[in-house]
Amino acid sequence: MVWLVAMTSRQRSLCGLAAHGLWFLGLVLLMDATARPANHSFSRERAANRDENEIIPPDHLNGVKLEMDGHLNKDFHQEVFLGKDMDGFDEDSEPRRSRRKLMVIFSKVDVNTDRRISAKEMQHWIMEKTAEHFQEAVKENKLHFRAVDPDGDGHVSWDEYKVKFLASKGHNEREIADAIKNHEELKVDEETQEVLGNLRDRWYQADNPPADLLLTEDEFLSFLHPEHSRGMLKFMVKEIVRDLDQDGDKQLSLPEFISLPVGTVENQQGQDIDDNWVKDRKKEFEELIDSNHDGIVTMEELENYMDPMNEYNALNEAKQMIAIADENQNHHLEPEEILKYSEFFTGSKLMDYARNVHEEF
């Protein structure tokens, strides 16, 4: 069953907000430092690939800390801070306009208008942006479901989906449909057969009782986006543990979690990448995933960690995000700090010398 935590609405005085917004606008207009935009080519490539394979469950899920293949989601913090505004901070954006946008976001997160962001305010914002990603997934799912339900009966069988999937891989749709109808063996390569097997397992899991192998629109959403379905989230966790678990005990040790991926390059540049891989995953394992710090991550711990609507996780993330930029150690995020560490929050470095902000202001 797809579930979503409802977000409480927040109200503020229009006069207070206007004054607050003017203060931020004045602050941003004072800054003329040069900007160095981040490289978003990977994100764009991933989005393009997603458009081409819209009926295939994505490896990347917005607002979820792990990819389906077990890799860390490098865009996670930007996704839960910017929500649908991520595209507004790409390499083509004008720096001053981007700074202004960032300050507008700051004012929205700063509910009590005290010109600083607390962990609680950031937590609520993260939950709001995560819900925003989910609503976007629901919207997109309606289009994807129509693509696999051409007769519009509100249900999709496994065979109907299989035809559409293979057609998206370049096979002749009519020939595939005829072969399935006549119970003939499909002429597909071994890799495609393996993918079909994995998709069938996921299809069965998304089929809510009583199982009929026909997916409704909501069930198809769970099929494509397991992160927002309790049963499918468990299935996703099992899949990740299965791929990383080397001794078959159905849990993960630190060595298993930080093991280097297959095909590791052997030159020095590759070694540097490997070192970063180990460092990042070790930090994530010890500080966030292994909640009882016993050196072992159970499926329950991994599920809690990956649950995008877990409020406790959102609070921990909020504290960590603030700590990254909290130079004055007051446990709050201030305008100068978020601008100086803009690359962490937006993917773009919007100014080089944040100290000039305070001096000029």
UniProtKB/Swiss-Prot annotation:
**Looking at the UniProt record for this protein, which Gene Ontology cellular component terms does it annotate, in alphabetical order?**
cytoplasm; endoplasmic reticulum; Golgi lumen; late endosome
Q: From the UniProt entry, list the residue stretches annotated as the region Necessary for intracellular retention in Golgi apparatus lumen.
A: 308-361
Gene induction: Down-regulated by ethanol. Down-regulated during the progression of cerebellum differentiation.
What SMART domains does this protein map onto? Answer: EFh
* Family (UniProt): Belongs to the CREC family.
Q: What is known of its domains?
A: Binds calcium via its EF-hands.
Its protein name is 45 kDa calcium-binding protein
Q: Which gene encodes it?
A: Sdf4
